[in-house]
Amino acid sequence: MGRITASELSWSVKGHRLLDNIEMAAHDGKIVGLLGPNGSGKSTLLRLLAGLRGPDTGTVRYDDTSLRDLGRRALARRLAVVEQDVTAHNHVSVRQVVELGRTPFRGRFDALTDHDRRIVDAALERVDVADKQHRSWHTLSGGEKQRTQLARALAQEPREILLDEPTNHLDIRHQLELLDLLGTLDVTCVVALHDLNLAARYCDHVVILDHGQVVDAGTPGTVLTAELIESVYGVNVLIDREPTTGALRVTYLAAVRETTARKAMQDDPR
């Protein structure tokens, strides 16, 4: 398992600050949910954590090593990334996509070993796409593509996984199976989610983003209050407990005209 920390992380485009002084941590073996409305900075933060973009200021660390000091191969051997929308050549098979997860452990011209093949087989089985392994990428549904990408990530045998809206395109069964699976992995997960009930049920820790800033962070039970959800999302909600599991439950009641956060931005523009 590994630890990810971000300190004083900021990022801008054409003078517009999209992330502002972000502080967050994902500790060994925990699932950390990034929550917030569209445009709040969740995907941008994940790209900075993955090293796909460099911050204007601040530092990302894996354990005690700065991301800047980790080579690409060293990072790929410990970190897997599952993005929202991934394209692949139409004629690549599901199995070939998953085999890409073994690339960091092979020489440039080396063939897959029997050990690699066993890892790929296990990853295909674990996310329920083994029966589709010979199908072409372009024939898959959105949910099947998402599960194939997760299998590719598992084939890396990572210490950390970053996932951007992994439940998008998935039916209810596969949403639950995917998040159940994350809970069984011996890895540290940072996952961007829209569904607050899934976050409350599966995340050990949540970070609430709005307008590129951290609004609050902590356990779902302490952070996901009716007041915060109205402020950030602009909806009135009822917070209670699901009677069977005892998990925190969010029931959406009505949209409000203007969120407190957005009014504050208008009153004090940056």
Tell where the protein language model's regions lie, with residue ranges:
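Conserved ABC ATPase "signature" region
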Residues: 99, 114-132
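Helix-to-loop junction immediately C-terminal to a conserved catalytic motif
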Residues: 50
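ABC ATPase nucleotide-binding domains
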Residues: 232-270
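Catalytic Walker B motif of ABC-type/P-loop ATPase nucleotide-binding domains
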Residues: 161-165, 170
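Conserved ABC transporter NBD signature motif
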Residues: 58-66, 75
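A short, proline-enriched helix->beta-strand linker immediately N-terminal to the Walker B motif
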Residues: 155-159
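The feature captures the beta-strand-to-loop junction immediately N-terminal to the Walker
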Residues: 35-37
